[in-house]
Amino acid sequence: MAEEAINPLRRRMIEDMTIRNFDQRTQQTYLRSVRSCCGYCKRRPEELTIEDVRRFQLHLGQCGLSPSSVNGAMVALRFFFRVTLRRPDAMDYIPIVRAPQRLPVVLSRSEVSRLLEATPSLKWRTALSVAYGAGLRASEVVGLKVSDIDSERMRIRVEQGKGRRDRDALLSPHLLKILRDWWKMTRPPVWLFPNRLNAFDHVTPKSLNRAFHDALGRAGIRKAVCLHTLRHCFATHLLEQNVDIRTIQVLLGHRKLETTAVYTHIAGKALKGIASPLDLLQLRPPPG
């Protein structure tokens, strides 16, 4: 968006998103999508037409973007037209791409063991153990504070996870031991995984992702997987342990409108007595 031309409109869009409690990351993503569309169509935001959006959508697809990435841009533009420009009619003309349903690739238990054992840094091995052992997203792992580990109730407090919802995640006995070993060695003051250059800030998802892929290479695992795969592994391995699917949805923080109340009721008792799949791994102690 051209700053001098669209400043008032940009401000209005930001206000529209703020009123609806969009987080900063979502706001930046929405603004970037509108700016990209304007740049491609060589128009100011208030001049955009439905035909411009259609051309932009085709352009994104031809550039090789995934359906989910294209849809993300279209959702942002839908919001811009419907809310900020007050043109709800535009919704009918900005379609959402139908994405193919693909099953996520998961690692076997032995592959997860190899991956963790191939992580030489105690910090990253602990962080990856949390990602798998509690089924957390990368942003949730790096954003953990020491105070989020509740050893009395055997839960990990996840604040403002995806969808800006707080939840409790599974803290198994073995994961607690791993976390205690890490804490005793480093005594982090606030963040569980502090930044090496600034102990009062946490590591980034990008750094954790790099550690994951480094370990993947060392372990000789050639599957097309990413850091989020550990979360898929957590859910899949629990299913293989015959844990009820509704319980798993609670542990992951997933939300379905028709079953939200059920998940809330079973979450309290579900967190006690469940063995994390991490507990079943036969891990060698870290070097040093």
What are these regions, as identified by a protein language model?
Residues 1-288:
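Conserved catalytic core of the tyrosine transesterase superfamily
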